Amino acid sequence: MGLTGKTLFITGASRGIGLAIALRAARDGANIAIAAKTATPNPKLSGTIYTAAEEIERAGGKALPLVVDVRDEATVKGALDQTAQKFGGIDIVVNNASAISLTTVADTDMKRFDLMHQINARGTFVVSKWAIPYLEKVANPHILMISPPLFLDLITALPGH
């Protein structure tokens, strides 16, 4: 099954793995909702939802850049609504947005841990929950979960999970 005409709602699609997935789908002629927080350039982070949209359209897809913080339920619902209205539905959700901390458990402050939990667990749940009504309307729906890297050394383990 190709992706021509299929609609993907991808969180964290302004850079990295999310953008790579979007570009690959765009080459097949997919519609891509770029659901990410970065609307203005940041010297520490490459790409914005708008630069991603330009790349997607150059690759052959249709793009909808949306400013979305996956922690904000109303924003997520609104972005899903906009996506379905623009493209006629949603076929695939890619939960890719994440926060990580490249520190040990002992060195990770609780504020950072809470942020990771809010984005990686709650945000993924919120997007999936509110996407289901759209996914139920299509023949072959999918939800793809992308997880941040895990570190399994129990003494110096990273706290992401």
Predicted regions mapped to residue ranges:
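Substrate-binding pocket helix/loop in short-chain dehydrogenase/reductase
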Residues: 104-105, 109-114
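Structural signature of the Rossmann-like NAD(P)-dependent dehydrogenase/reductase core
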Residues: 10-11, 95-98, 141-148
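Active-site beta-alpha loop architecture of Rossmann-like, nucleotide-cofactor-dependent enzymes
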Residues: 100-103, 153
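Catalytic loop of short-chain dehydrogenase/reductase
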Residues: 136, 142-161
